[in-house]
Protein backbone atom coordinates (compact mmCIF):
# COMPACT_ATOMS: atom_id res chain seq x y z
CA UNK A 1 0.00 0.00 0.00
CA UNK A 2 1.71 3.15 -1.21
CA UNK A 3 1.00 6.39 0.58
CA UNK A 4 -0.42 9.04 -1.67
CA UNK A 5 1.11 12.46 -1.32
CA UNK A 6 1.10 15.83 -2.99
CA UNK A 7 4.05 18.20 -3.18
CA UNK A 8 2.88 21.39 -1.49
CA UNK A 9 6.31 23.03 -1.31
CA UNK A 10 5.33 25.93 -3.59
CA UNK A 11 2.27 26.86 -1.52
CA UNK A 12 0.43 28.73 -0.14
CA UNK A 13 -0.64 30.69 -3.19
CA UNK A 14 -2.78 33.83 -2.97
CA UNK A 15 -5.23 32.60 -5.60
CA UNK A 16 -6.25 29.21 -6.96
CA UNK A 17 -7.57 28.39 -10.41
CA UNK A 18 -11.08 27.02 -10.90
CA UNK A 19 -9.63 23.77 -12.26
CA UNK A 20 -11.60 20.81 -10.92
CA UNK A 21 -9.40 17.86 -9.99
CA UNK A 22 -10.81 16.75 -6.65
CA UNK A 23 -8.71 15.45 -3.77
CA UNK A 24 -9.94 13.99 -0.51
CA UNK A 25 -8.26 15.27 2.63
CA UNK A 26 -7.73 13.44 5.92
CA UNK A 27 -10.46 15.71 7.31
CA UNK A 28 -12.96 13.96 4.99
CA UNK A 29 -13.43 17.15 2.99
CA UNK A 30 -13.25 17.20 -0.79
CA UNK A 31 -10.93 19.90 -2.13
CA UNK A 32 -11.55 21.12 -5.69
CA UNK A 33 -7.90 21.00 -6.72
CA UNK A 34 -4.31 20.70 -5.53
CA UNK A 35 -4.01 24.43 -4.90
CA UNK A 36 -7.02 24.54 -2.57
CA UNK A 37 -5.81 21.39 -0.83
CA UNK A 38 -2.24 22.64 -0.40
CA UNK A 39 -3.38 26.00 0.96
CA UNK A 40 -5.42 24.08 3.55
CA UNK A 41 -2.39 21.88 4.37
CA UNK A 42 -0.28 24.98 5.02
CA UNK A 43 -3.05 26.50 7.17
CA UNK A 44 -3.27 23.29 9.21
CA UNK A 45 0.50 23.41 9.90
CA UNK A 46 0.91 20.10 8.10
CA UNK A 47 -1.68 18.16 10.10
CA UNK A 48 -3.94 17.78 7.05
CA UNK A 49 -2.86 14.98 4.73
CA UNK A 50 -4.12 13.52 1.47
CA UNK A 51 -6.52 10.63 1.95
CA UNK A 52 -6.90 9.83 -1.76
CA UNK A 53 -7.39 11.40 -5.17
CA UNK A 54 -11.00 11.99 -6.18
CA UNK A 55 -14.01 13.00 -4.15
CA UNK A 56 -14.37 11.86 -0.54
From Swiss-Prot:
Places the protein is found: Secreted
Any one GO molecular-function label of the UniProt entry: serine-type endopeptidase inhibitor activity
Keyword Hydrolase listed: no
Kazal-like domain segment(s): 6-56
A family per Pfam: Kazal_1
GO-annotated cellular components: extracellular region
Main subcellular location of this protein, as a coarse class: secreted
CDD domains: KAZAL_FS
Domain of life: Eukaryota
Site, as annotated: Reactive bond 3: 18-19
Residues carrying covalently attached carbohydrate according to the record: 45
S-S pairs: 8-38, 16-35, 24-56
Keywords, ordered alphabetically: Disulfide bond, Glycoprotein, Protease inhibitor, Repeat, Secreted, Serine protease inhibitor
Membrane-crossing residue ranges in chain numbering: none
Protein known as: Ovomucoid
Organism of this sequence: Oreortyx pictus (Mountain quail)
Amino acid sequence: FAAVSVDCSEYPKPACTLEYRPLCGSDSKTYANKCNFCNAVVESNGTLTLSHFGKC
